[in-house]
């Protein structure tokens, strides 16, 4: 764990999670300024964690922990081959004879959870991997600041959005009347959501058509729990259910999936199943118990799994925060989780089952979480929208010509792309030129630094020249 963070440094200020890390190099600095200390799992001293040092005109930041390896391990977990260890306080009995994503999580029940408000059961309230990423980003930004240089950053979302929200619905039991009831609620709220449909049964054709006409997403809810015909944890059964839903809903393709009861086995095989069928987004990593609510897989940012050979598997994972406010946990949990996501510029993914929409206070809970997210400036996107945007965003390239000149290119057209440019404190007259023309920019503060924000459209295969 990283502890005793120096709050006066932009690198280590503002971090609230336990900063649980795995692996790295132990050292005790004999020169420089320690910004954080390292302790082992028993909270015994293990050396310095972060040290900055100046030597002549040079500047270094030493990070003892393997931050990238820690992020990957927390996100992907260990292979799920047996039940995980339950929470000692009884809040998460994950030893339920059902193999699921939580059985592979690696965080600590004691040190990595905190209550949303005092006197409530602890949950994974703070996104640890988000903050480990921020440490890396802020260390790099600090190096640029020390050298009085700017650098461009391709922001996470279009139109200057700082974070977004997503709502999914698992169609368990496929009750048509309850489905209409939930659709009516989200339609009145003017948000688009993702419907994960479970085999067998489904809904009437008119319902699927309404979802398509109103720009909702139809996704798969892979059932490997009931162990009836075609509902076992096999690639063949996954393929069968995938094809069934395409025919059932009358759609050409499926882009997203969430596993029923967050079922999971082994480590990466399911991502390969998804990739083979063209599923580009999965939503299965998340809590099935009260004590694992929040960020048991570390973060609010979507991520691509890394295969054992080091290559990316092209299936974006969007972690789920909680299921069914009111049914699973009090309504105010939703606001607390949104606050955590907002602080880290991530995605707040909530699951509401149609099966619960007519139960007392559930409808009001949906309304409350939607309206509160809007107050934080979040838009509600479908899983498919998030996946499509991330695919587009990752094709954009920034090429450094020299310290104040850059080119931006993309093989496809992408609209309303957000870029932010670091403004070091030593620069008093900051300006941005695009293709030789001065443009207006918006001052913003992110990661404890000052930035200039611009929003531009990028045409396919056209070079945009940027000069600062």
Across the structure, where does each feature detected by a protein language model lie?
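Alpha-helical scaffolding within the catalytic cores
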Residues: 46-47, 148-154, 178-180, 200-212, ...
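Metal-dependent polysaccharide deacetylase catalytic core of the NodB/CE4 family, i.e.
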Residues: 162-165, 175-177, 184-271, 276, ...
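Extracellular ligand-binding/catalytic regions of CAZymes and related secreted enzymes
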Residues: 55-59, 65-159, 360-397
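An acidic, glycine-rich "communication" segment
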Residues: 1-58
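Beta-strand-turn-beta hairpins that frame and shape the catalytic cleft
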Residues: 52-61, 160, 309-316
């Amino acid at each position: 764990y990283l502890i005793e963070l120096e709050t006066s440094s932009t690198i280590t200020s503002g971090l609230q999670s336990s900063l649980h890390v795995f692996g790295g190099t132990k050292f005790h600095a004999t020169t420089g300024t320690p910004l954080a200390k390292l302790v082992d799992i028993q909270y015994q001293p293990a050396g310095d964690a972060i040290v900055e040092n100046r030597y002549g005109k040079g500047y270094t930041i030493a990070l003892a922990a393997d931050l990238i390896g820690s992020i990957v391990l927390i996100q992907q977990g260990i292979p799920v081959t047996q039940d995980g260890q339950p929470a000692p306080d009884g809040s998460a009995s994950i030893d339920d004879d059902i193999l699921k994503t939580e059985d592979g999580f690696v965080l600590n029940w004691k040190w990595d959870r905190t209550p949303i408000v005092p006197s409530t059961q602890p949950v994974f309230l703070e996104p640890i991997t988000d903050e480990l990423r921020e440490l890396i980003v802020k260390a790099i930004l600090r190096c640029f600041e020390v050298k009085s240089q700017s650098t461009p950053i391709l922001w996470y979302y279009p139109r200057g959005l700082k974070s977004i929200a997503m709502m999914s619905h698992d169609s368990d039991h496929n009750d048509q009347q309850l489905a209409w009831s939930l659709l009516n609620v989200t339609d009145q709220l003017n948000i688009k959501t993702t419907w994960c449909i479970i085999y067998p049964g489904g809904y009437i054709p008119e319902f699927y058509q309404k979802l398509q006409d109103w720009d909702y997403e139809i996704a798969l809810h892979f059932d490997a729990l009931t162990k009836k015909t075609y509902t076992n944890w096999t690639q063949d059964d996954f393929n069968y259910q995938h094809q069934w839903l395409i025919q059932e809903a009358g759609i050409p393709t499926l882009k997203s999936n969430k596993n029923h009861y967050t079922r999971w086995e082994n480590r990466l095989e399911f991502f390969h199943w998804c990739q083979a069928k063209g599923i580009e987004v999965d939503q299965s990593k998340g809590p099935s118990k009260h004590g694992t609510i929040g960020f048991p897989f570390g973060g609010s940012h979507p991520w691509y799994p890394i295969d054992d050979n080091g290559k990316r598997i092209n299936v974006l994972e969007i972690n789920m925060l909680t299921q069914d406010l009111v049914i699973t946990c009090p309504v105010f949990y939703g606001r607390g989780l949104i606050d955590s996501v907002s602080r880290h510029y991530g995605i707040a993914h909530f699951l509401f089952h149609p099966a619960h929409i007519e139960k007392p206070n559930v409808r009001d809970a949906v309304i409350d979480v939607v309206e509160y997210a809007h107050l934080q400036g979040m838009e509600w996107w479908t899983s498919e929208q998030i996946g499509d945007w991330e695919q587009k965003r990752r094709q954009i390239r920034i090429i450094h010509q020299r310290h104040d000149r850059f080119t931006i290119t993309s093989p496809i057209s992408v609209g309303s792309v957000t870029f932010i440019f670091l403004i070091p404190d030593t620069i008093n007259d900051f300006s941005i030129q695009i293709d030789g023309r001065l443009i207006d920019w918006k001052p913003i503060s992110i990661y404890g630094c000052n930035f200039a924000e611009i929003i531009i459209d990028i045409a396919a295969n056209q070079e945009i020249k940027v000069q600062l």
